[in-house]
């Protein structure tokens, strides 16, 4: 029996310099760890077959399904501000594209599937730890409502890989709206290949921004669309305390999805300077730097598109600068509206933005836990005078004590009753996030003991992040001092 992948491959129809055709490297003994059955069904795939030994072979790259494109995509990128003219998929192979049940085109990619022409000195493989991290966090982000790539499956290869230590090898099957990045445009722009930039832009418009095709200036509309999606995405990150960790231009999705989870982390104690990534020595990608870094990345995209914006280079630059100037307004509108909702404010008053910013400042001064503070504020929404459980989260509650009466006065001016206010706040303030120490514990159990129980349990909790789960209350707790994760690692 063979499974049918209803491939409809568009990227593989682009010119040959957009990718390299390469087959996955077979592995010794594929063993399925986790299959995302609801996602498989959404993609029009048979989850029962994928859950079989033959399915595991497909998901590990040991066999290719009929009609697979099997390509490694070319791209460049700025890595920590330094331009690298050729990167590309060094350990990932795009099997192909399918149209899901919602009519949306989706990439299906194997990550850790062997060497490609873009591997440079790498082995093309993935270690189990990073595969589990991406599976956990990407699926948690989806449950939180954040645009993201998805994880269809995680498979053990039966082989070992050498990183800082020897680990079991694994393959992640990743699903995305596409894997086109800012760095994909940079790859061709750096080579002066304007026709390739135009072909890529036309492909992106057709796939992700069809409304731009009807605009008077389609490439300008494309740039505006990418800027809007990135501004909204980063605002959503900031609302949940997510730190990407490696916001290079090759990790910036043109589709506006969170991609490449590497050394990502979630903030515990609120501090805008928080950095977890072991390779971010200067704090370039710290939590509070994410909005300006996103704008920096978008500026690199705009540079690639200047020749398409106007035949006159100076005019093209002027157009790009004007459009980039709209990033801050879009980001602030999304971010401040989100913060207001987290505080239970669903009408608008002039001082709402200041109230939100003052709350964040109080959290920073008091070293309060970001996620738990907002959640407990939601719990107090029925009776805004009962803020003791929120206050208890602050090492130094002085600033919170100054802020709390202002919030009480403001929130009681809202038209909802207490129960409706609480329900609305709980719908945007999660009880459960992928706490770094919980993710690390799940990874360690799997890598060190071949015990996937903590991994599966954590996924169960994170599938419903906004709903109280009394049997899993411990997953809402911040880490104890001895549990704190101080650094996260890329895993490549």
From Swiss-Prot:
Entry cofactors: Mg(2+); Mn(2+)
InterPro entries, sorted: SelO
Catalytic activity: L-seryl-[protein] + ATP = 3-O-(5'-adenylyl)-L-seryl-[protein] + diphosphate; L-threonyl-[protein] + ATP = 3-O-(5'-adenylyl)-L-threonyl-[protein] + diphosphate; L-tyrosyl-[protein] + ATP = O-(5'-adenylyl)-L-tyrosyl-[protein] + diphosphate; L-histidyl-[protein] + UTP = N(tele)-(5'-uridylyl)-L-histidyl-[protein] + diphosphate
Binding site residues for Mg(2+): 251, 260
The keyword Nucleotidyltransferase appears for this protein: yes
Chain sites annotated for binding ATP: 88, 90-91, 111, 123-124, 174, 181, 260
One GO MF term attached to the UniProt entry: ATP binding
Regions that span the bilayer: none
Keywords noted in UniProt: ATP-binding, Magnesium, Manganese, Metal-binding, Nucleotide-binding, Nucleotidyltransferase, Transferase
EC id: 2.7.7.-, 2.7.7.108
Residues at the active site: 250
Keyword Coiled coil annotated: no
Coiled coil segments of this chain: none
Family, similarity comment: Belongs to the SELO family.
Functional summary from the UniProt entry: Nucleotidyltransferase involved in the post-translational modification of proteins. It can catalyze the addition of adenosine monophosphate (AMP) or uridine monophosphate (UMP) to a protein, resulting in modifications known as AMPylation and UMPylation.
Protein name: Protein nucleotidyltransferase YdiU
The species this protein was found in: Rhodopseudomonas palustris (strain BisB5)
Lineage: Bacteria, Pseudomonadati, Pseudomonadota, Alphaproteobacteria, Hyphomicrobiales
């Amino acid at each position: 029996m063979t499974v049918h992948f209803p491939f409809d491959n568009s990227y593989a129809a682009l010119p040959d310099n957009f990718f390299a055709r390469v087959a996955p490297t077979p592995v010794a003994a594929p063993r399925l760890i986790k299959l995302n059955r609801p996602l498989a069904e959404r993609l029009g795939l048979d989850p029962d077959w994928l859950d079989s030994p033959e399915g595991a072979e497909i998901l590990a790259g040991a066999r290719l399904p009929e009609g697979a494109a099997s390509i490694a995509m070319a791209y460049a990128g700025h890595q920590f501000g330094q331009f690298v003219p050729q990167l590309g998929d060094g350990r990932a192979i795009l099997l192909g594209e399918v149209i899901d049940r919602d009519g949306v085109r989706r990439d299906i990619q194997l990550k850790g599937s062997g060497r490609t022409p873009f591997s440079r000195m790498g082995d093309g493989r993935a270690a189990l730890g990073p595969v589990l991290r991406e599976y956990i966090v990407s699926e948690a982000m989806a449950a939180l409502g954040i645009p993201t790539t998805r994880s269809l499956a995680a498979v053990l290869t039966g082989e070992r890989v050498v990183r800082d230590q020897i680990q079991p090898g694994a393959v992640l099957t990743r699903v995305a709206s596409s894997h086109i990045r800012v760095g994909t445009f940079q790859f061709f722009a750096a080579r002066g290949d304007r026709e390739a930039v135009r072909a890529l832009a036309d492909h992106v418009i057709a796939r992700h921004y069809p409304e731009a095709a009807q605009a008077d200036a389609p490439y300008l509309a494309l740039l505006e669309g990418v800027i809007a999606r990135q501004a909204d995405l980063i605002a959503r990150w900031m609302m949940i305390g997510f730190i990407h960790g490696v916001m290079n231009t090759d990790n910036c999705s043109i589709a506006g999805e969170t991609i490449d989870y590497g050394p990502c982390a979630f903030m515990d104690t609120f501090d805008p300077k928080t950095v977890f990534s072991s390779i971010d020595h200067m704090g370039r990608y710290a939590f509070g730097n994410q909005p300006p870094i996103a704008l920096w990345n978008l500026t690199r995209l705009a540079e690639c598109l200047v020749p398409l914006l106007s035949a006159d280079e100076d005019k093209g630059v002027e157009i790009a600068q004007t459009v980039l100037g709209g990033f801050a307004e879009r980001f602030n509108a999304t971010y401040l509206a989100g913060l207001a909702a987290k505080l239970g404010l669903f009408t608008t008053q002039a001082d709402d933005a200041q109230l939100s910013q003052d709350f964040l400042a109080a959290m920073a001064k008091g070293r309060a836990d970001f996620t738990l503070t907002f959640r407990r504020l939601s719990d107090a929404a029925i009776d805004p005078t009962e803020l003791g459980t929120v206050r208890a989260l602050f090492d130094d509650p002085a600033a919170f004590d100054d802020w709390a009466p202002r919030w009480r006065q403001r929130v009681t001016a809202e038209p909802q009753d207490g129960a409706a206010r609480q329900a609305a706040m709980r719908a945007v303030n999660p009880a459960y996030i992928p706490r770094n120490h919980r993710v690390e514990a799940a990874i360690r159990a799997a890598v060190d003991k071949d015990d996937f129980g903590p991994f599966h349990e954590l996924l169960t909790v994170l599938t419903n992040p906004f709903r109280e789960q009394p049997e899993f209350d411990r997953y809402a707790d911040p880490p104890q001092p001895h549990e704190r994760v101080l650094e996260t690692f890329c895993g490549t």
